[in-house]
Amino acid sequence: MKKTSVRDIALEALIKLEQNQAYSNLLLKSVIKSNELSDQNRGLLTELVYGTLQNKIALDYMLKPFINKPQKVKPWVIQLLRLSLYQMEYLEKIPDRAAIHEAVEIAKIRGHKGIASFVNGVLRSIQREGVPSFDAIEDPVRRLATETSHPEWLVKEWADAYGFEAAEKICRIHLIPPKQTLRVNQMKADRAELLDQMAAEGIEVEKGDLAEDAVKLLKGTIAGTHFFQNGEVSIQDESSMLVARALDPKSDETVLDACAAPGGKSAHIAELMKNKGSVTSLDLHKHKVKLIKEAADRLGLTIIHAETMDARKAGETFENEQFDRILVDAPCSGFGVIRRKPDMKYTKKPDDSARLAEIQLSILREIAPLVKKGGTLVYSTCTMDRTENDEVIHAFIQEHPDFEPDLSLEKRLPEKVRPFVRDGRLQILPHYFGTDGFFICSMRKKG
């Protein structure tokens, strides 16, 4: 067996993720780039890494009865057992014997015969005896958390906020890989024509479920195609596309995107403005500001001005009442995108949301004076955590009586999401439409 077998590459990626706490989506991109893989093997690698990572707690629960002294087992061997068990329990297309054989071969090369024998023994025992049932866990929250590999505290938080049934739906949909969605650049393309052109070139696509400029990519990737390179489409989740619609920017207006990287929402705003007016896009990190500029260049958008700046100091640079509309797409816990970044389930802590809420509120406080009277302030996050969403907005409006909920938000959003809009706020949970979890709140400045 060659060192570069797909399973060995997957194991190497899992080891790096565990050691470096790297983002899974970024690491996987770099691993794919550095290994020459066929489309089929690229798909298998993605499946193995994401699947093993996404089901880590469940896999450890299944492995536990078969490992006598887990503290003595090397971390890479645990990763190998998880990877192999994932194939045995979750991937019907891979025969158990193939998964076990590959695991033993990898163990021989990476370790020695003793480790190979141990790996073989554990996996053969599982094959013979079967894994323990999750039904043995009496507490329903703990059972759900274990079966769907979420931290127990997080499942409890969702159950308290939305009810146990909704928490279960959130957890289960997180285990289903998301489809890639594209936003059509209406400055350069028409969605209906683009769908026909893509189909003619063998790209499997269909209309999006929510946004009028959305296209669902059913198979393959878009980044290397001329559609992407020529700026006809951008990669963006449908719930994220609703943010610019909520802001509702018009041509010739002055808009601020206070936390803009990597630039998808800034670009959408500029497209809706027909590339007329001004969009100032801020981000704290210089390398991320570069991404905003690159996105604008690719899409042919000249009204985006990207600057490196902490939004919490924006008042030092900009005038009061300078902007018609401001978007604060705030840094957040990101629980709405767990399907795309499964590793975050294991790295986040219960007090993260309270810490982030302070940052979010401080950004809103700094930005508030910059909105013109009668102007719009939209706050959004990709999380379902009420501490970062409703509680932040409640605190902000209490402190700033010159802002009020924008009750016209509902009319600006697609019909399907309107029933979920309350008091100028929209909370999308991932199971509603199969999109990322997202929170959007629109406020008007009185006067």
Curated annotation (Swiss-Prot):
One of its GO terms (biological process) is regulation of DNA-templated transcription. The active site is at C382. CDD domains: AdoMet_MTases, Methyltransferase_Sun. It catalyses: cytidine(967) in 16S rRNA + S-adenosyl-L-methionine = 5-methylcytidine(967) in 16S rRNA + S-adenosyl-L-homocysteine + H(+). Its EC number is 2.1.1.176. PROSITE patterns: NOL1_NOP2_SUN (PS01153), SAM_MT_RSMB_NOP (PS51686). This is Probable ribosomal RNA small subunit methyltransferase B. The keyword Transmembrane helix does not apply. It comes from Bacillus subtilis (strain 168). Keywords: Cytoplasm, Methyltransferase, Ribosome biogenesis, RNA-binding, rRNA processing, S-adenosyl-L-methionine, Transferase. Pfam families: Methyltr_RsmB-F, NusB, RsmF-B_ferredox. PANTHER family: NOP2 YEAST -RELATED NOL1/NOP2/FMU SUN DOMAIN-CONTAINING (PTHR22807), RIBOSOMAL RNA SMALL SUBUNIT METHYLTRANSFERASE B-RELATED (PTHR22807:SF53). GO terms for cellular component: cytoplasm. Belongs to the class I-like SAM-binding methyltransferase superfamily. RsmB/NOP family. Transmembrane segments: none annotated. It is found in: Cytoplasm. The keyword NADP does not apply. Specifically methylates the cytosine at position 967 (m5C967) of 16S rRNA. It comes from the Bacteria.
